[in-house]
Regions:
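Beta/alpha (TIM)-barrel catalytic core signal, keyed to glycine-rich beta->alpha loops juxtaposed to Asp/Glu
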Residues: 22-165
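Glycine-rich anion/phosphate-binding loops
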Residues: 1-3
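Active-site groove signature of glycoside hydrolases
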Residues: 7-30
């Protein structure tokens, strides 16, 4: 891990990272992070000042997020979650419940996929008509961003569309 971390610093031309993510945290990645003590390594880099703010992008069920934050929450400064109105109650994503877990541990949330890769920008005509009837000046993207950004605990909601329609 040390070699890869140093290569990342060198590649970016920096002495430290302002924000650093443990990426794609789910069951398989979590198991590997525990096996190779990636959490301890990241905590060490924070203590050395090589990482200012440590986060993780999470891609699994809320129960696993609760387990991770229960064990390692003290090292994480933020959590990146997939939050949009389609995935809010989806059984295989459970954005709403994951956000509740992040809030339980008082972790600021950075949103990923607020427009679901552009899907929520290019809506079917029937859905777009409902939105336009309610607010003619609001775009489909603005509805998606307002939904994600208005959730409790959300502090960053970047654009992430693959298509701007």
């Amino acid at each position: 891990m040390e070699r890869i971390f140093n290569e990342q610093l060198e590649y970016c031309g920096v002495d430290y990272f302002d924000y650093y993510l443990l990426h794609n945290m789910g069951t398989n990645v979590y198991d590997k992070c525990q096996k190779y003590d990636a959490f301890g390594f990241a905590a060490k880099k924070k203590a050395e000042g090589k990482i200012k703010y440590l986060g993780m992008s999470f891609h699994d069920m809320p129960e696993l997020l609760d387990e991770i934050l229960g064990k390692y929450g003290d090292i994480f400064d933020f959590i990146q979650l997939q939050i949009n109105y389609v995935d809010w109650e989806q059984p295989n994503v459970q954005s709403h419940r994951c956000l509740e877990v992040a809030n339980k541990y008082k972790k600021p949330v950075f949103v990923m996929e607020p427009c679901k890769g552009g899907t929520l920008v290019n809506l079917p005509d029937e859905a777009l008509k409902l939105m336009k009837d309610y607010d003619p000046d609001a775009s489909a993207a603005s509805w998606a961003f307002r939904f994600a950004a208005s959730q409790e605990g959300v502090v960053v909601c970047p654009a992430g569309t693959r298509s701007n329609g």
